[in-house]
């Protein structure tokens, strides 16, 4: 109900809210068996993510791709907590905010990620969602956030070098 009220809409059109089923961890985990792709997007805490993976892993089908939308935690470290059978179907998928308007998505493979799974995910992101995809290494903050930090530091340096206030 809240999504339909947001301006601008986080969805392509407001009627798309009808495609979303509200669910919770206590009663609806079995619904995950019907999903082709599960994207985890909770707070950037390794312990919370690991706990969530332990809860959802038993409910995923043998073909479900699972991805973390982390913006900087190690994808390999996250993968290490998953059952071995799931690891080839796990990767990082970093959308930028707001995802409806931001074109770029980073795919971050793990040591165990299946190349065919990553290729299929990239095809889906480009053809169905219209995203531009960059493959990133499992390095701190991946590609775009590293560039962003360097850019912010450069602005701060030049602002100080020219004697400007940061509000000018």
Language model regions located:
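Rossmann-like NAD(P)-binding element
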Residues: 4-66, 72-77, 84, 104-105
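Generic secondary-structure signature for well-ordered alpha-helical cores
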Residues: 4, 8, 61, 123-131, ...
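Rossmann-fold dinucleotide-binding core
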Residues: 65-146
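Helical "substrate-binding/catalytic lid" subdomain
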Residues: 126, 139-168
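A short alpha-helix-loop-beta-strand transition element characteristic
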Residues: 12-15, 116-117, 165-166
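Beta1-alpha1 glycine-rich phosphate/pyrophosphate-binding loop at the start
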Residues: 1
């Amino acid at each position: 109900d809240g999504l339909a009220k947001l301006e601008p809409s986080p969805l392509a059109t407001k009627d798309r809210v009808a495609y979303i089923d509200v669910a919770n961890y206590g009663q609806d985990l079995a619904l995950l068996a019907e999903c082709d792709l599960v994207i985890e997007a909770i707070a950037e805490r390794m312990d919370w993510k690991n706990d969530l993976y332990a809860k959802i892993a038993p409910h995923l089908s043998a073909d479900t791709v699972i991805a973390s939308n982390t913006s900087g935690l190690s994808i390999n470290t996250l993968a290490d907590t998953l059952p071995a059978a799931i690891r080839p179907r796990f990767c990082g998928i970093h959308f930028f905010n707001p995802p409806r308007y931001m074109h770029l998505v980073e795919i971050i493979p793990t040591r165990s990620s299946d190349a065919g799974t990553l290729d299929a995910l990239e095809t889906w992101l480009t053809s169905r969602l219209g995203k531009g995809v960059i493959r990133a290494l499992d390095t701190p903050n991946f590609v775009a956030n590293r560039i962003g930090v360097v850019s912010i530091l450069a602005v701060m340096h030049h602002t100080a070098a020219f004697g400007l206030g940061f509000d000018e």
